[in-house]
Amino acid sequence: MTGGRFDFDDGGTYCGGWEEGKAHGHGICTGPKGQGEYSGSWSHGFEVVGGYTWPSGNTYQGYWAQGKRHGLGVETKGKWMYRGEWSHGFKGRYGVRQSLCTPARYEGTWSNGLQDGYGVETYGDGGTYQGQWAGGMRHGYGVRQSVPYGMATVIRSPLRTSLASLRSEQSNGSVLHDAAAAADSPAGTRGGFVLNFHADAELAGKKKGGLFRRGSLLGSMKLRKSESKSSISSKRSSVRSDAAMSRISSSDANSTISFGDVDCDFCPVEDHVDATTTETYMGEWKNDKRNGFGVSERSNGMKYEGEWANNKRHGYGCTVFPDGSKEEGKYKNNILVRGIRKQLIPIRHTKTREKVDRAIEGAQRAAAMARTKVEIANSRTAHARAKADAADQAALAARQECDIARAVARELSPDFYQPGPDYVKQRFQEGVDAKENPEEKVPEKPPTPKESPHFYRKGTTPPRSPEASPKHSHSPASSPKPLKKQNPSSGARLNQDKRSVADEQVTAIVNKPLMSKAPTKEAGAVVPQSKYSGRHHIPNPSNGELHSQYHGYYVKLNAPQHPPVDVEDGDGSSQSSSALVHKPSANKWSPSKSVTKPVAKESKAEPKAKKSELAIPKNPASNDSCPALEKEANSGPNSIMIVLVMLLNIGLAILFVHFLT
């Protein structure tokens, strides 16, 4: 056997022993352009036992076969380490993957580099999942056990379904600190707590409340007991119907439960849960979520048995609250839409009861099946730990072969550069710098969950869209700048000085001679229009819609600010809207003059204004608009109260007849 150094055309180099033109014995080989390094033993051109070091500092130490990692070995990648078996370059069959910074780890079976079969996953906060896996996701039967509520991780960005496991890992091996435990759980909840619901039905009931909503008291003629329990701590009386709740479930449930990637300022209010409370789910899993039949139980006595969909109570089931009361029926996105309660006309009561009973039986069977799968997962975990210990011994042997190969390479070619140790030193130095300067990385953490460049989710915007969106949003933003500066400031001054309708009429009359002093014909034509602008500007829908495009709220404009606006023709025509946008720029300084002069003459002009209001009936519609609105406002509650009293009498009569019969 001979040896030496051989330089490849792609920039790689081999330095070590060879036989019959192939690497044999001990040696070091670098990849193209000198990137990456393998050092260890060789056999007729293939690696046998040794270690490979990537330029990033990631390493593998163990056994090889046909140029691929095969057998036992240890891989260190970023903040994660895998110890166990390898099969043709992929992780499997048994192995342990653990975090170097947190308690997060997975112990069990693998297939094609993903969790598959049976295993136990421990999350960053200490919670566990024991059961079946498929394609790297929880799939089958399993048990999810949380830690006490006070120690559970707060979910802030629902990107992944594991707290700090493989599916929370970025491409460079690092872990997202804000990874979530449930993709469809609201931001701000705790990992492993899916029964932590605020009063979703009650919040929705407030939006669609009232006795006169369609399908309530008169719609279905169905009365419920005062037992609306949609959360742990909030139990309030209500009168609801199935039709009303079915409308609430789809739209309002999404607005109160599913928050997606939002800041925690908009998180739902959490229920008052004791810090020592734990939660356990036993049942079916599909695609890494609670789907099918299952039982979720808390240590404080709350329990749900029934059907699940996407980590939510969905289907038929029964909820038992800590005080012993029950809520059973059909759920839709965590909201009870059909309950089993006393009704005037018991329609579908028996069918609902049968479906609930079947759902409870199915949930109990699924929980029993999950417990049996846990036993199998624990046995697989014990075997995986044994393989991990054997992999440590294989890594030790690989390091010894690596040291021999480096010594041989130094003897054959003393000037040969071995990049492997420098890769490891560079990675270690980066870790030390990160620990010494933690303050520099603290402000960099918040933007990572928002950008998350290493994740792709269906429906997300491609990376090129943000480049075009600022250009599109910048051009319209430049035009409303003068409007923002003029309208709110002048409107605020006028609102402080003139708070009543009479004062606004005074300003319209006082400003009339000021505007008529202009010698041009345009100003003279605009003068009578300024009288109506102060009165009709608030109820004008077209003008309000125009300014809501720029400001997001209705802007109150006075007569001296926009003299050329034709309010009488402002019923949605394009000419009036264009005048509102372009003409105020020509009269930028006119509002300042018109505001200062009427203030000085305001005390003298008050008696004239009162006389002019009585003498000049130029706009009777504007003068009578406010009293008409007041009459309608005063007559509205009276009619509502009359109908309310009638309906209450009818309801009491129906109840009286019902109790007598």
UniProtKB/Swiss-Prot annotation:
Residues carrying Phosphoserine: S157, S216, S220, S452, S465, S469, S475
Residues exposed to the Cytoplasmic side: 1-639
Gene Ontology biological process terms, A to Z: calcium ion transport into cytosol; muscle organ development; regulation of cardiac muscle contraction by calcium ion signaling; regulation of release of sequestered calcium ion into cytosol by sarcoplasmic reticulum
UniProt xrefs under SUPFAM superfamilies: Histone H3 K4-specific methyltransferase SET7/9 N-terminal domain (SSF82185)
Bilayer disposition of the protein: Peripheral membrane protein; Single-pass type IV membrane protein
Single Gene Ontology MF annotation: structural constituent of muscle
TM region(s), chain numbering: 640-660
InterPro entries: Junctophilin, MORN
Coarse class of the protein's main subcellular location: membrane
Keyword tags: Cell membrane, Disease variant, Endoplasmic reticulum, Membrane, Phosphoprotein, Repeat, Sarcoplasmic reticulum, Transmembrane, Transmembrane helix
Modified residues (Phosphothreonine): T448, T461
Domain of life the protein comes from: Eukaryota
Keyword presence, Translocase: no
Pfam families (alphabetical): MORN
Keyword Protein biosynthesis: no
Recorded domain comment: The MORN (membrane occupation and recognition nexus) repeats contribute to the plasma membrane binding, possibly by interacting with phospholipids.
Disease: Congenital myopathy 25: A form of congenital myopathy, a clinically and genetically heterogeneous group of muscle disorders characterized by hypotonia and muscle weakness apparent at birth, and specific pathological features on muscle biopsy. CMYO25 is an autosomal recessive form characterized by prominent facial, ocular, and bulbar features.
Purpose: Junctophilins contribute to the formation of junctional membrane complexes (JMCs) which link the plasma membrane with the endoplasmic or sarcoplasmic reticulum in excitable cells. Provides a structural foundation for functional cross-talk between the cell surface and intracellular calcium release channels. JPH1 contributes to the construction of the skeletal muscle triad by linking the t-tubule (transverse-tubule) and SR (sarcoplasmic reticulum) membranes.
UniProt name for this protein: Junctophilin-1
Gene symbol of the encoding locus: JPH1
